[in-house]
Amino acid sequence: MKDIWSAWTPLEAKIDRHSAEISVWNRVYRFEDSLFPTSIRIGGCDFLSRPIEFVGRYNGKTERTLKGCTLFELESTDEKTEFQLSAQMGNTVVNGMIGVEFDGLIDMRFSVIPFWSFSRDNLAKPQLDQLYIDIPVKKEYARLYHYWPNDVTSIIPSQTVVNADALPEGGLRMPFKPYVWLGDEFKGLGVSIESDENLEYENAQTEWIPGEDEFVLRIHLLDRMPAAWQGRRDQWVSALNPIDYRIGIMATPCKPVSEELKTSWRAFHVFGNLYAANSDGSVVDCPYINEIDGGLDYLAEKGVKWIIFHESSSRAQDWGLAENPERFRAMIHDCHAHGIKTMMYFGYEMSTLCPSWYDHAPDYLINTPDGHYTGGWQRLPHQRAFMVCYRGGYGDELIRRVEYVMDHYGIDGIYTDGTYVPWECANARHGCGYTDRNGARHTTFPIFAVRKLVKRLYETVHSRGGLIDTHQSTCCIMPTLSFCDTYYDGENIQGSLIKALGSDSGITSFMSLPAFRTEYMGKNLGLVDQFISYANPALGWSIEKTCALTLIHDVLPRPRQAGEMTFESLKTDLDYMSKIWKACAEFETASSVWLPYWQKNDLANVTTEETYMSVYQGKRTLGVLSNLGSRPREVEIQTPAAAMRDVFSGATYRAENGVVRFTAESCVPYLLEIL
């Protein structure tokens, strides 16, 4: 196994004619005469209540097992294993090629093939009229769900929909979504399907079906005989084509999160433009952060370990091309001299200023079914940038540009905006989309192509000792996110959170806490999240209020600089966040045992409505309490401790009859040392 994959453990595979057992970090998949896993273990727990079933219905008769099933090992290394399956179900042949990689992705390509024209007993006539996959998960683990995209299009996410939540007792039904996930706060299972081309379903394509001791995730493939087979039978001169599928299955979390990463990931995001326009349209340069008197001294003093330079760090959007290389290198050098590492922006677009625009734009860009481009961001220097599909060749250029900025500018890592998102695309020039039987074009979602790119990206950056932070709002597709280090989520819902904050119902009236735990906490994914906080003092929204929501989930928001580059613009978020960082370091939260608010513990439990408290148990014990209601309230904390001390104010609250009481303001986090 390459050293670059040291975050994971080597894959181990045991495959014989009838079974396969594949072990990766924290997970074990087992196949017994089956196309899909019969057992999935996550962290030593049996996640499934019973084997996954591949179910077919033939002339009204339901088939749940494969006949004559054999497996054949093609390749096995400590990074990947691949084996074939051959079987029969009803009057169809089932063939498959199953690959499992070291991060836990099962890449399943399989075909359902009608019997040939020489079959006896009328078996040459197609009989298949239903096909689906049942994934039965133990009810104790089947509590949360996520899907993507959160709207009818993936090109721009809805600002009013959170595509994650607690699983309703009565279950759920949805149309086709290329990614769905089911699990709890610490583990789960995701299913990826790039295309709905061979999905012929009547109503819902995905169902979460409740049972007595399980929830079944049902993936509908066919609710009727395939249209291409109807009214026909196989002939030697005109065969019935196989129906092909490609499905990814991946248990999560994908990898361990190191204590060192949690401790050192103190990032500060510089959004301020390096360009400005005069009234006559001419473009002028703006100050760099190292040119602000005392700016880097202040950032270092406040504990910043990483600076992320946003899009205007490149002359051409997403291209990693500094306007003034010497000046840019000097800025990076000065950051390093202050003990601060740097990241440069790359994203999901190709600029009209990109040197290869005129040669390759038609091949690289996303196309809608009617041939239009998508996006079109406009910025200085004057340009527009349209969305790329990483199934095209732009990924090769991206890798070269990342190598360039790390090798020539001394950049330490990269921030990717949307790069890990498999945006829908219908560009036939690079193989996306499909044409249906009526001649209409449809989009597909290049999940596996994006995965291939970001895996290369991870190699490129980590071989140079760097990190990758990705912004992917609403999209928690683990086959791609597996190859980043941290993620930055929540941009699309900032407006809705602000609106909810000002309502009588409070912030959770828009986003439930189970929704936050599913998408924004990261523990079920194996990643560190930093929540987006776009402070808006005029509307009462600050990074402190964001902390009230995030800190009880062991998640830190990211401070940022926005607007004109001035010393004051550095302080908007950082004066407060530096105190949070200092407290986390003082109490060694990264190495402490974390006791979440939704599970009772022996140290501190809040009984007050809309108030929540999580605890870090270490050499010293720290509680984080938030009143997420819309008004101040007196809170009651049941505890065996003698008292609690407010880390920021120094106030001490003594317990009376095992209860600590004090008044907590709305949406203000309280860091309390439990004495």
Q: Language-model segments: what does each one mean?
A:
Residues E656-L675:
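C-terminal beta-strand-rich structural cap/linker in extracellular carbohydrate-active enzymes
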